[in-house]
A protein has these predicted regions:
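Compact, glycine-rich, soluble single-domain proteins
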Residues: 2-136
Length: 136
């Protein structure tokens, strides 16, 4: 049976006006928040505890940092044009800077999906997996 994850009803306040969507693979589906505005992209998941983290998509994002994070996260790098996973960096601890795979990712084509630590593996999100993205 496929794994399904939904966003909690009591999302942190910073996500109140953010867009939401669902990603589906052959084995899983999960909801996520879309960080499409600068203030939300800047703040992201920083300052949230492990139990408060939610999946967060950062469109047009070739690098991420975990400065200000209180818990480890997974980052799944997506090719936005093909909706395919390029790579996954798992269990990234706070105070790290990570770039998308490849020497120079195509500008605007890469997206980063931040997840609570362990979620990428639990949802079967690895290189080569195709996602079907559905706006909520």
């Amino acid at each position: 049976m496929p794994t399904a994850r939904t966003l909690p009803a009591d999302l942190p306040r910073r996500f109140a006006r953010a867009g939401r969507a669902t990603a589906r693979t052959t084995d899983a589906s999960f909801e996520f928040v879309v960080a499409d505005r600068f203030p939300l992209r800047l703040r992201g998941l920083a300052g949230l505890g492990a139990g408060e983290l939610v999946p967060l998509l950062l469109p047009r994002c070739g690098s991420i940092h975990t400065f200000g994070m209180r818990a480890a996260i997974d980052v799944v790098w997506l090719d936005s044009e093909r909706a395919e996973i390029l790579a996954a960096d798992t269990e990234l601890p706070p105070r790290r800077l990570v770039r998308a795979p490849g020497a120079r990712p195509a500008r605007g084509r890469i997206a980063a999906l931040e997840l609570p630590a362990g979620e990428a593996e639990a949802l079967g999100l690895g290189a080569g997996v195709a996602l079907r993205l559905v706006p909520s």
